[in-house]
């Protein structure tokens, strides 16, 4: 044994080359070890109501609507998710949430997910109303039809149209399973008028203050879910309704249902909040060692042949 150690010490270069060769051969065999990892599944819901057309956000210095900003933020977020993560997309309008598809693997379906995001449009909305609070119940109903658990990430400005009153504020105490959800606030605290477009995206004007109120006689029919609002355009700049990020109401709603809240203007804050959400499940998966072995072999070879290293060894 002592003789072998002496030989290896006296023939260090040969020994290291042999080790590098062994590591490369092992790397070619693609060995792996089982590791336990968390699998995350997200249901990303996008508010496509008309207040999301408000232009009070910016991307690289360019003013954009809240909806365009949401899509941009989702592109960034999805691109950063590791393979194995599943993502499903949904749209919110009125009181309802619809699922475009169940959560699918981000790597295997990356192009399809990105293409779907690119085509999200406010004109897909099926009503002009925006009842964010009630949509929490609708979201839970959608999740019940999913083949496996998923965590909700709900992007919205929190704008309620028509405005909430005591008779049309839905009690959320009966909502079950929302403890891991994440509400993401989109919009500025300064706000801007809500544009009203034609179905060809031509600007007609801006929603008035009156348009955000309940239509006459709405209180008696609130319980029946038949609330409507006025459809008035602002006659002048002073009459335009300014929509701000309803952060306080979203924070209150998140607290009521046991969810978390974060602003969407920070990618890092959003990613951190999503990482804190509970995984859909845990599973054992193979971790390939070939890259680790190949890297180790490469470092050995670099250590042997770098001129500066040989120079240092020459002074010893």
Please describe what each predicted stretch is.
Residues 1-37, 275-316:
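C-terminal signal-anchor/stop-transfer transmembrane helix together with its immediate cytosolic
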Residues 24, 47-49, 89, 139-143, ...:
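DG-centered beta-turn motif at the end of beta-strands
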Residues 32-50:
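Alpha-helical transmembrane signal-anchor/signal-peptide segments
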Residues 39-40, 52-86, 105-110:
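…and closely analogous acidic/polar surface helices at protein-protein or active-site interfaces
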Residues 41-43, 253-293:
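Juxtamembrane amphipathic/hinge helix adjacent to a transmembrane helix
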Residues 56-66, 76-77, 99-104, 120-129, ...:
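Second-shell loop/turn segments in exported
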Residues 86-119, 142-143, 273:
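Short beta-strand-loop
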Residues 158-243:
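VWA/integrin I-like adhesion module and closely mimicked acidic/polar interface patches used
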